[in-house]
Design a protein with these regions (language model features):
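Class I SAM-dependent methyltransferase SAM/SAH-binding core
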Residues: 1-29
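Conserved class I S-adenosyl-L-methionine
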Residues: 4, 67-94
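Short helix-capping segments at alpha-helix termini
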Residues: 12-17, 64-65, 101
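A short acidic, Gly/Pro-enriched loop at the edge of an enzyme's catalytic core
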Residues: 29-39
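A short beta-strand submotif of the Rossmann-like class I SAM-dependent methyltransferase core
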Residues: 37-42, 54
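A short His-aromatic
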Residues: 44-47
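A short glycine-rich, Lys/Arg-flanked "PGG" loop and its adjoining helix->strand segment in the class I
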Residues: 52-67
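Core SAM-dependent methyltransferase catalytic element
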Residues: 100-122
Length: 122
């Protein structure tokens, strides 16, 4: 809740009105069906206690054609000085996302120690 308050304050100070913060649970993002164009998870997915349930919830909240972006530390790169439990391989991310009906769109390799992998809901 504290981070939500901080985000809301930050947005209000800047006059941003097209962002709505939502406090999720461990298993759901608590968003209405087909209400989201884009979901971005930066170094989050590997930390989830219930990743399958959360991803199902995200997919349900996406509009048709909506996208999900996973940004995770590259497990494939031993030079990335992050503990292995905080890394994910592109193969692992692709396997999990496609199992939830998402279609791989592209992989962004320009980040120094992470990959950003973009999927689209059909």
């Amino acid at each position: 809740p504290e981070m939500i308050r901080m985000l809301d304050s930050h947005l209000a100070k800047r006059g941003v009105r097209n962002v709505v913060s939502v406090l999720c649970s461990e298993t759901t993002v608590k968003l209405p069906p087909a209400s989201v164009d884009l979901a971005i998870m930066v170094d989050v997915y590997h930390e989830l206690a219930y990743p399958a349930e959360v991803l199902d919830s995200i997919v349900g909240a996406l509009k048709p054609g909506g996208r999900v972006v996973f940004v995770e530390y590259r497990a494939e790169d031993p030079a990335v000085a992050i503990k292995p439990l905080h890394k994910m391989s592109e193969t692992q991310i692709r396997r999990e996302a496609t199992a939830h009906g998402l279609k791989w769109e592209r992989s962004i390799k320009s980040l120094p120690i992470q990959h950003a992998i973009v999927f689209r809901k059909p």
